[in-house]
Every structure is written in structure tokens, then in C-alpha cells.
């Protein structure tokens, strides 16, 4: 089987046979088009998700995924019942508040996988100016001794408009998070130290961190980082933070605006923050 816009040239005969079966048997990801993915693409039905779905399944079969794994990825990406409403409230953010794509991340400053994800997510905002917004939510894990203290430090810095400066300092110096270390970072980023320290130790700041944690619990956050893109979980057990995120964002921009997404301004892989190895997945509670 050949479908316009789908490159299957790199597939082996067995892989192409599997892919052909999948796109012939799985329904198009638009309820208004109750036909197979293959028929949807072939007949150019009015479902902008069909061609991306067919291409997603190419990536899945090329990666050696089973039928079950490929279907899980397909439904995670396209099922209409997977989208949740997430209130960003006063959470710190980067990018336009009217961006077509909003990325919400629950993270822990002591989590190595979060440290790895941070520059990748920020790069997405830089690569798509005005189209992507990144929102940070606090979710310190009980297993991390300094996670709660670091989250409070970032909230206290946020109150002085210095959240992202503290965010960067904490991830850059993740191995040094004793109170004296965090106090040094606060001084380095130029906050009013007395006010910052009072806020760092206040109940109001602890409540602010706990509010994000409760919101995370409500959407079943079980580890960090947990990432949602336009209300849909970007499941890091199924999708790679670097290899798949750009395609995901481009499609969401196109679906939201009806216009092709611009190519990123800067090509190339995004380096992990001071990390030589790529972590396998999110930290669990």
C-alpha cells in the first residue's frame, strides 16, 4: 500500500505489511470520518489528523513497536477523550499567553529527568515565537530531600519576578541544594534577599507549592517530569522528549491555526543541561 504524503521507503517488506494492516484497520482519528486511516488519507477526507496518524504509525513500526504498542501511541496522540482542561492560573510561564500551543510541565528541581527536559522545553518556545507557551508547575517528590525547599525558593523568587533565573540556577547546580547553597543562588540572581528569605520560609509559599501538587494529583501525575501539550499528556513512556516533541508541536500549531507551522529558527539537537547521557524516562514518586 502507498499513501500520498507517507514515506514508507525505509521500511522492510515485513514492516510495510504490518503498517499497511494498521492503517487499514484503525479508524481515522476524527469521529466525523468513520473510515480507516488509509481511506481517510487516500480520499483526502476532512480530517487533518489522518496523514499525521499514518506517519506516526510509520515511526512506530520502524522503531520495532508491536501492534499493541503502536495502538497505544496512536490513541495517546489522537484520541479525543485524552484531552484535559488544565488551569494555568498564575503559574510562571514563557511565551505568549495567546499562543496556539501551551505546554504545561509538572517538575521537581531535584529530578535529573526534569533537568534534562528543561532546555528542550524552553527551546520549543524559542523555536516557535508567539506560537508556544511553556507553563511550570511545582511537583516536588517525597523521595527528593531538597525538592520541597527548592520549589519554595523558586516561588519566593517568582514573587520578585525572578522565577526563571532561580529555575536555571537550581537545575544548573542540582547537586548542591543545601539551604546555604540555595541562599547563594538567591543572592546571585539579585533578589531582595531579606524579602526572599521571608517568603521562602512562609506558610503562604508552602501552600502555593502544595496547590500545584494537588492540581497534579487531580490529573494523575505519578512522576516528573509530567508534560501536557494543549491538555493532552505527552507520555514520555511512548514519545521521546527530543525526537518527537517538535513534530507534536508543529501538528498542534497547524490544528489550532489552520496554517502550516513554521520551521524552527535553529536546527539541530538540543543538548541536555550539563548531562552526557540521556535519561530513560520520568522519575516516579
PLM-predicted stretches and their roles:
Residues 13-28:
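Immediate flanking context of iron-sulfur cluster ligation sites
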Residues 118-139:
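Conserved helix-turn-beta segment immediately C-terminal to the redox Cys motif
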Residues 1-2, 17-18, 34-82, 264-285:
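N-terminal targeting signals for export/organelle localization
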Amino acid at each position: 500500500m502507498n499513501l500520498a504524503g507517507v514515506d514508507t521507503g525505509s521500511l522492510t517488506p515485513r514492516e510495510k505489511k504490518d503498517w499497511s494492516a494498521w492503517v487499514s484497520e484503525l479508524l481515522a482519528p476524527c469521529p466525523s470520518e468513520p473510515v480507516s486511516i488509509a481511506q481517510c488519507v487516500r480520499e483526502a477526507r476532512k480530517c487533518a489528523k489522518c496523514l499525521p496518524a499514518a506517519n506516526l504509525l510509520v515511526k512506530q513500526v520502524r522503531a520495532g513497536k508491536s501492534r499493541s504498542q503502536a495502538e497505544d501511541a496512536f490513541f495517546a496522540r489522537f484520541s479525543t477523550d485524552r484531552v484535559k482542561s488544565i488551569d494555568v492560573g498564575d503559574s510562571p510561564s514563557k511565551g505568549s499567553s495567546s499562543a496556539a500551543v501551551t505546554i504545561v510541565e509538572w517538575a521537581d528541581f531535584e529530578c535529573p529527568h526534569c533537568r534534562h527536559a528543561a532546555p528542550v522545553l524552553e527551546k520549543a518556545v524559542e523555536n516557535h515565537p508567539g506560537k508556544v507557551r511553556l507553563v511550570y508547575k511545582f511537583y516536588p517528590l517525597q523521595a527528593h530531600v531538597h525538592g520541597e525547599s527548592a520549589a519554595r525558593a523558586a516561588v519566593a523568587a517568582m514573587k520578585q519576578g525572578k522565577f526563571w533565573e532561580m529555575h536555571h540556577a537550581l537545575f544548573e547546580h542540582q547537586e548542591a541544594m543545601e539551604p546555604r547553597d540555595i541562599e547563594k543562588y538567591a543572592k546571585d540572581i539579585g533578589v531582595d534577599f531579606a524579602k526572599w528569605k521571608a517568603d521562602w520560609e512562609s506558610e503562604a509559599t508552602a501552600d502555593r507549592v502544595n496547590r500545584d501538587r494537588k492540581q497534579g494529583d487531580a490529573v494523575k501525575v505519578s512522576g516528573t517530569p509530567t508534560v501536557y501539550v494543549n491538555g493532552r499528556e505527552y507520555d514520555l513512556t511512548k514519545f521521546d522528549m527530543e525526537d518527537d516533541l517538535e513534530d507534536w508541536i508543529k501538528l498542534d500549531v497547524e490544528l489550532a491555526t489552520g496554517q502550516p507551522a513554521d520551521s524552527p529558527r535553529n536546527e539541530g539537537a538540543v543538548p541536555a543541561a550539563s548531562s552526557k547521557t540521556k535519561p530513560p524516562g520520568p522519575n516516579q514518586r
